[in-house]
């Protein structure tokens, strides 16, 4: 049986399953529903949350997981995944695959909000963050007797071809630590000064929503200069949330900065936002807080819709004439008229940081 670690994302389609897993029968894939398929197996106490967040968070977190993980009929649970910089936890994978990938709403929502309150730029690219400590606690206390084997990779994709640099297999935290050390070396790209204009291509087969497309914001924000510009070439983006409920919240509240979103979140009248901390955290992560401009170049959603959530909008077909991803090279490019841009063909595979600020 295959249980894709989808979190709140859309289920894996038959086409995606075939592309990723070859000829494994589609009926072997079990879609995880983060609202209905979980059981509560424990709790991370409020006192521990206060300790690891320096007093910024005061509520406990329920530990919920897909009931199949607890099913004794399975004598081996293999959890494969790629370790890369991640906006919510610092470095992706390992126990995140379990507690978010096939976890429940309380853990997904609160872990995202803890990360947003603590500060994304304090965590990205690092181990032992508050969010990672939540998952470490839950794994050690509530899943220690389950037969879970982690299979972690570290990859890059120069020229669009995936190169695997490391494969780490085991049932301890050491496999994560070794993978993180290599991923920090391979997946963090330092620039010597702040980037004035960053152009990021979002592959339409992978990025169909701003929920996913905003990875370009998270991964470049530590490299973009004050007053700079981020332009996302987003031919596949046709909606905001992967989930219809989240899509509605993004359209209602928009990406309008950390302070504004926290004020909206704390307003008792906004119960819909208060009930979805993951969405609130996403709205915080997706804003530059006015430090640089964010523009989506789109073709499958109207410019008015994009502007309605607080981003700038441009026409994809117009922008791609000037910034053709087929002709641009990764890194700095100088255009015929002298404009200098920094081009990233896939934001998912790295983290870009201005060395002056790290």
State where each predicted segment sits:
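Extended hydrophobic packing segments that form well-structured cores
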Residues: 289-358
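Structural motif
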Residues: 78-80, 197-201, 231, 342-343
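Short acidic, glycine/serine/threonine-rich loops at helix termini
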Residues: 12-18, 41-45, 88-93, 160-166, ...
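C-terminal catalytic subdomain
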Residues: 207-298
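Membrane-embedded hairpin module used as a gating/binding unit in multi-pass transport
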Residues: 121-206
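Conserved phosphate- and dinucleotide-binding cores of soluble alpha/beta proteins
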Residues: 58-145, 149, 155, 164, ...
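An acidic, phosphate/nucleotide-engaging active-site surface
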Residues: 11-90, 306
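Short connector loops at secondary-structure junctions
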Residues: 2-19, 34-44, 115-119, 154-160, ...
